[in-house]
Amino acid sequence: MSELLSFALFLASVLIYAWKAGRNTWWFAATLTVLGLFVVLNITLFASDYFTGDGINDAVLYTLTNSLTGAGVSKYILPGIGIVLGLTAVFGALGWILRRRRHHPHHFGYSLLALLLALGSVDASPAFRQITELVKSQSRDGDPDFAAYYKEPSKTIPDPKLNLVYIYGESLERTYFDNEAFPDLTPELGALKNEGLDFSHTQQLPGTDYTIAGMVASQCGIPLFAPFEGNASASVSSFFPQNICLGDILKNSGYQNYFVQGANLRFAGKDVFLKSHGFDHLYGSEELKSVVADPHYRNDWGFYDDTVLDEAWKKFEELSRSGQRFSLFTLTVDTHHPDGFISRTCNRKKYDFDGKPNQSFSAVSCSQENIATFINKIKASPWFKDTVIVVSSDHLAMNNTAWKYLNKQDRNNLFFVIRGDKPQQETLAVKRNTMDNGATVLDILGGDNYLGLGRSSLSGQSMSEIFLNIKEKTLAWKPDIIRLWKFPKEMKEFTIDQQKNMIAFSGSHFRLPLLLRVSDKRVEPLPESEYSAPLRFQLADFAPRDNFVWVDRCYKMAQLWAPELALSTDWCVSQGQLGGQQIVQHVDKTTWQGKTAFKDTVIDMARYKGNVDTLKIVDNDIRYKADSFIFNVAGAPEEVKQFSGISRPESWGRWSNAQLGDEVKIEYKHPLPKKFDLVITAKAYGNNASRPIPVRVGNEEQTLVLGNEVTTTTLHFDNPTDADTLVIVPPEPVSTNEGNILGHSPRKLGIGMVEIKVVEREG
């Protein structure tokens, strides 16, 4: 209703101003600004819906000030360009319409009415309401009733008798199981759901709407609100260190806790969270690659669901035979947005909707089959009678190719329980949320019926039942939940441990690299993660007087304040203010002690602008002084004009990447020498080893042969045509996720370059 009212007010404002207000520059500018704000707000809402599937939520507030890198970003570039072009066109059209009667005399009354209607349209818009609520949530001090509702359970289960298998289905919300809306989409897992305790109204709340947040909510009974962006939690050394979570209780009760997934455990700090709360046995992509049947059978995120669930079954068998009490948690990945992935062993590889194949529905149908196969193996085993099986979605599906169809339904998270000891078949329509999952499991296992803000849906009352405005209430508790981190409020001294790649201050520990904004009463950590911008881009958003401490590889800050360190990959510490003074210190000891020193200086806006502009230079445009191309640092030597076909810097160098160009091309600013030696330190990837690799300068071509280990080769070139471009053509680029950023599409690797040097020959 508010959308219609808001749009009606917007339209009325446009029409009244265009046909009645007349000519006046100030009123035109004011009305266009407010109407433009309405357009921007609604486009922001549309864009946020596209990325999150949940409007302008807590995650969007972070994304608005940081670049989105990570899973499937290339799939969002075209919509992003479309939004920018559409916004430009709308503003142009709006200005043209408002000035239609610019030759008529100004009318104060109609101008005022048009402006008031425009302001009303903004105030009535859902986007404005969502942003207002988010901003309020950032500035609140908390809610006095938090302590009354947050309850810590007993640290043990008195007499545990059941093992636990807990399956997180990536984005596998309950909506998919509506057979009327999506016929025969989930027959295998749907049948199992109908055999157990099926909780049909599991709501998604703020701070529970992405994987690590859903895991924290379901195991600790609190949303994931932190002093930093949630997916950047890989940089912390402990996770809600004071809280009692399900894993802690299980471990204290004699359980061995296991977690198995196909993706890298470090992503979003799942390893830190689980290790902080009772899990001693973790298996992700790195741990599984030495034990799975086919280590090369992977998708963009890691191992496919059939591989992961096979390993989970082996672990279930092994643990059950041992007779020890255990919990086994597993997380699937094949249903990850935007398209999902199809395991090769499932029978349901294709699902048509609206008369055409739909990749996301196909991935859901395949993944649910794999999950059902795993559960049926457990049910058929002699150990089922001692086992509780839980299946839940980690969060609602984000914007995938099925999302517009999901939005036509009443959407809820999946949560059902199959008890081997006491079969129960019932659909429970009680209002609940993700935070109730852990408390419900704890209740079934014989423990308390509460966990944090969660309550057992079998014997307690959910916060979703107590509070009709539970989303707003959750946001009101946000400051209270952030305080549970016990995060320091000051930073005077710090220690850098090079062996562990950690920084410690005021009792807290973070992984490097790290950027910190330091004020009188707050220290704000800004870690680098798969979903955040590089730290230098985050620093570029700081105000001129903001105090910062930036710990990163020396070459990343060298172009600003320490050119002598431009080729150093050691750790450096920079601190100061962008508009004031900055210092760079080289970390030259294994354990390095530092102190913060922020001088109260006069802010120089020219210096500030120069620093910001330099920080925002993209990697490929960075230039450094050197007599060779060093590939393990960003940028290129000053003599290089541009280059292509080369991937990002890694600790050893850079790979060629045929996704960026079929050949490695390095164009120099000036012609290469008439006679020169080309000294190449490099290695080959896969089938490119021991194969002739063409290297061309102008009309002359030499052959390079590389192995799988780094070697140095010298090629002799004559350059009579004064060519300025070096071209290297890997013969057989290989599509692989080797060394890839989690969630990115595979790269096509050919050769790995460490250094290329041009040495002029005399004569």
Swiss-Prot record:
Signal peptide: none annotated. CDD domains: LTA_synthase. GO terms for biological process: glucan biosynthetic process. The keyword Cell inner membrane applies. It catalyses: a phosphatidylglycerol + a membrane-derived-oligosaccharide D-glucose = a 1,2-diacyl-sn-glycerol + a membrane-derived-oligosaccharide 6-(glycerophospho)-D-glucose. It comes from the Bacteria. Its EC number is 2.7.8.20. It is found in: Cell inner membrane. Gene3D superfamilies: Alkaline Phosphatase, subunit A (3.40.720.10). It is an enzyme of class 2 (transferase). InterPro entries: Alkaline_phosphatase_core_sf, DUF7024, OpgB, OpgB/LTA_synthase_biosynth, Sulfatase_N. HAMAP family: MdoB_OpgB. This is Phosphoglycerol transferase I. It comes from Escherichia coli (strain K12). The gene is mdoB.
